[in-house]
UniProtKB/Swiss-Prot annotation:
It comes from Ignicoccus hospitalis (strain KIN4/I / DSM 18386 / JCM 14125). One of its GO terms (cellular component) is cytoplasm. GTP binds at residues 15-22, 92-96, 154-157. InterPro entries: EFTu-like_2, G_TR_CS, GTP-eEF1A_C, P-loop_NTPase, Small_GTP-bd, T_Tr_GTP-bd_dom, TRAFAC_GTPase_members, Transl_B-barrel_sf. Residues 71-75 are annotated as: G2. GTP hydrolase that promotes the GTP-dependent binding of aminoacyl-tRNA to the A-site of ribosomes during protein biosynthesis. Belongs to the TRAFAC class translation factor GTPase superfamily. Classic translation factor GTPase family. EF-Tu/EF-1A subfamily. Residues 92-95 are annotated as: G3. Residues 195-197 are annotated as: G5. The gene is tuf. It is found in: Cytoplasm. Residues 6-229 form the tr-type G domain. Mg(2+) binds at S22. This is Elongation factor 1-alpha.
Length: 442
């Protein structure tokens, strides 16, 4: 099957720092034949020189990333690989400082996630601590609407004793309890014991863990359910913009993922908040010209008369007859995860929704609600603290597109960030639209 016939899945790899995400992805790409021996040899030589033998596969990812960053193409420069059943795009190779921020903007576009946890003594516990990213990433994945998760229990070669079934079971139990509390269907989640370093259970079944009878990592990827394109295609068009390139001979090329609706060559589109628009001249995906783009497609497209200065990351493209909503203010159900003291009216976190990030002030805290039942506990509370859920009204300080969650899920959920941390997560229940004049280029 060619990549056209295979269903396409966007994958995000999450988990605590140093739990082996990059090494696992590197080894996976290598085992599936998406990295040639020559590249690997070169990387190994370089790694040896710098005494980084053990980071062989992680290095590979960084190298691939640098290569791509040097040659900017229209395509969303992501890592791609195929399994027998699917054509995958990894939409964020983790590891950088901005990963949570990227995860918030990227996760809204992921169809599934691989959560990597380390089984090495002390490392799993660090990831699950109050400051741990394992907890934070699982929580964000849930908010961002990712229901399909594969858990890779990594570094099984480093347990005490190595390949310990007891340690594996302990980790699975802890994670199941935590994830169940967040509403994940834990019985549908595969927990695959792997070693990113030795390659155990990535493609080949591990001889070191005969006690494990479940799928390998690649089998677990193939067991994922395909995304429902039909459901999203029926909605009006929404394409959050990730980047805007100037390509010689083509012109301005916004790049993004079609979240809802269908984009065809010849369509008129408008970008909000700026309100500029024009006719779609061409659409490209994975370096190939296409006539129409469906939900889930990562595309670059050229619009007549729209210049690079008119639009930016965070803008959203739609059809002029049903343009994306620019919010004057919006109401949301929020859940507070972290704050050093308390949150009151006037607090201004940065709201990350789809690819946008805009500082927004809390102008009213309407109700405190029970996070489990949604019942109102208190009207007009004076402050909120971690663990509270509430109905809150925000006013964005700059124009921003945000939609009701019920109407456009991918554009109706957000994370609140402050001081480099995720303060809370939320879903939009109502939007008071701002007036924006639409200027279509002839």
């Amino acid at each position: 099957m060619s990549k056209k016939e295979k269903p396409h899945m966007n994958l995000i790899v999450i988990g605590h720092v140093d739990h082996g995400k990059s090494t696992l992805v590197g080894h996976l790409l290598y085992e599936l034949g998406f990295v040639d021996e020559k590249t690997l040899k070169m990387l190994e030589e370089e790694a040896k020189k710098r005494g980084k033998e053990s980071f062989k596969y992680a290095w590979l990812l960084d190298k691939l990333k640098e290569e791509r960053e040097r040659g900017v193409t229209i395509d969303l420069t992501f890592m791609k690989f195929e399994t027998p059943k699917y054509y995958f795009t990894i939409i964020d190779a983790p590891g950088h400082r901005d990963f949570i921020k990227n995860m918030i903007t990227g996760a809204s576009q992921a169809d599934a996630a691989i959560l990597v946890v380390s089984a090495r003594p002390g490392e799993f516990e660090a990831g699950m601590s109050a400051e741990g990213q394992t907890r934070e990433h699982i929580l964000l994945a849930k908010t961002m609407g990712i229901d399909q998760i594969i858990v890779a229990v990594n570094k099984m070669d480093a347990t005490e004793p190595p390949w310990s079934e007891k340690r594996y079971k302990q980790i699975v139990e802890t994670l199941k309890k935590f994830m169940k509390g967040l509403g994940f269907k834990v019985d549908e989640i595969p927990f695959v014991p792997v070693s990113a370093w030795t390659g155990d259970n990535i493609i080949k079944r591990s001889e070191n863990m005969p006690w494990y009878k479940g799928p390998t990592l690649v089998e677990a990827l193939d067991n994922l359910k395909p995304p429902s394109v039909e459901k999203w295609a029926k909605l009006p068009l929404r394409i959050p913009i990730q980047d805007v390139y100037s390509i010689t001979g083509v012109g301005t090329v916004p790049v993004g993922r079609v979240e809802t609706g269908v984009l065809k060559v010849g369509d008129k589109v408008v970008f909000m908040p700026p309100g500029v628009g024009g006719e779609v001249r061409s659409i490209e995906m994975h370096h190939e010209k296409i006539e129409q783009a469906m939900p889930g497609d990562n595309i670059g497209f050229n619009v007549r008369g729209v210049s690079k200065n008119d639009i930016k990351r965070g803008d959203v493209a739609g059809h002029p007859e049903n343009p994306p909503t620019v919010a004057d203010q919006f109401t949301a159900r929020v859940f507070v995860i972290w704050h050093p003291s308390a949150i009151a009216v006037g607090y201004t976190p940065v709201i990350h929704a789809h690819t946008a990030s805009v500082a927004s002030r809390i102008i009213e805290i309407k109700q405190k609600i029970d996070p489990r039942t949604g019942k109102v506990i208190e009207e007009n509370p004076s402050f909120l603290k971690p663990g509270d859920a509430a109905v809150v009204v925000f006013k964005p300080l700059k124009p921003m597109v945000i939609e009701k969650f019920q109407e456009f899920q991918p554009l109706g959920r957000f994370a609140m960030r402050d001081m480099g941390k995720t303060v809370g997560i939320g879903i939009v229940t109502d939007v008071k639209p701002a007036k924006v004049e639409i200027k279509m280029k002839k």
